[in-house]
């Protein structure tokens, strides 16, 4: 079964499209899900469940469109700021299994908050900085493998 966002991309379900490019697309969420006027979802056009599965090139195109949408929100709606929200993978509260970024317009004193009011209960015994630095030393290799895997899935 196809994911809901892939169905939108294939025009099986109507959407309020803001932009459709070769590698990324942007649309408004359903009115009942909108967090603010102009709240926009930006997705890669090639299915990736989350950020871990997306190819570097797909992610770059998606983020370039996120920036264009952010500029349009500022210029057209007068929102001086935006929040970028994304959830990816188990435990993240990801609502649709297709990588997506919420671009939420923000105005001073809009009454909206995005920061959690409490810290995570999860603990890591070792130094998170050291663990992440070690993982990053091999991240380029993993990223290349992930991109190659995504390229194979497209062909």
Question: What are these model-predicted stretches?
Answer:
Residues 1-155:
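HIT superfamily nucleotide-processing domains
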